[in-house]
UniProtKB/Swiss-Prot annotation:
Database matches in HAMAP family: UPF0235
Organism taxonomic ancestry: Bacteria, Pseudomonadati, Chlorobiota, Chlorobiia, Chlorobiales
One cellular component term from this protein's GO annotations in UniProt: cytoplasm
Annotated protein name in UniProt: UPF0235 protein Paes_1868
Family in the record: Belongs to the UPF0235 family.
Coiled coil: none
Pfam annotation, one family: DUF167
């Protein structure tokens, strides 16, 4: 079950990133986190930038609203989407993750 928490006018969640993949995609749930594959390598912040841009594009929000709060040098990252509630985020992620439950 993926946990989404509302904090400071946005929604906070954890992502497990898999860099150097053949394509960028939202894969599913991994240990309470949203698992995504990223085409970019984890060099010079490229994977972090792609992580934010890819999630923004996939969820239909501006890339400036998606930020990494912690985990810049780790595969486990804590992200926020500004101006979005947990219920809205669960709905948007649910379009990509059919069998995943969300803890709001």
């Amino acid at each position: 079950m993926v946990r989404l928490k509302e904090k400071d006018g946005g929604v906070v969640f954890f992502v497990k990133a898999q860099p150097r993949s053949s394509r960028s995609a939202i894969i599913g749930e991994y240990d309470g986190k949203i698992k995504i594959s990223l085409k970019a390598a984890p060099v010079d912040d490229a994977a972090n930038v792609e992580c934010c841009r890819f999630l923004a594009k996939s969820l239909g929000v501006a890339s400036s609203r998606v930020r990494i709060l912690s985990g810049h040098s780790s595969r486990i990252k804590r992200l926020t989407i500004d101006g979005m509630g947990a219920a809205e985020a669960a709905t948007l992620f649910g379009e990509h993750l059919e069998s995943v439950e969300f803890d709001l």
